[in-house]
Amino acid sequence: MYKQVFKKLKEIGQHTSDIECILIVGSVARGTNIMGSDLDIMIISSNKSFLVHDKSFIEYFGIVCNSKIECNGTCTSIRVWYQDENEIEFGIVDPSWISLTLDSGTKKVLTEGCIRSSLIRNMSFCFIIRLQNGIALIMVGIIYMDMCTAIFN
């Protein structure tokens, strides 16, 4: 269902210097999505304001029927409805979103919503590891947090 989207995310992650990493979160990442579930994508970018205001990247994923910007604290989301009936929510955050001190919302997303899905298992090419001492290793790419759940507790 989302195979082409994941392929395009990988291309964007590899070719866009402003994007530090891309996370698949929510029901698709957990493998609990049902028909009609949206795809939740977190984009950690050093140029958040450009991505939010330009928005042209959303057209890379299909023909846009409608889009809406939602502000949720440190995350600005662009919710997009595509002609193929897919709905994608792009959550765009600064690198500080995954800072040393996690707020409860960020912690919930990272522990419950970034779990490897069998749909995307073989598409990962980079990773993030947040150690208990607060050191974070962030690499460009799509990342999955299945092995990191215990670290965040």
Give, region by region, the residue ranges found by the protein language model.
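Generic structural signal for well-ordered secondary structure
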Residues: Y2, F50, E70-G73
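Residue-level preference for short coil/turn positions at secondary-structure junctions
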Residues: D18, M35-S37, G73
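Helical scaffold of the NTase/Pol beta-like nucleotidyltransferase catalytic core
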Residues: M1-L23
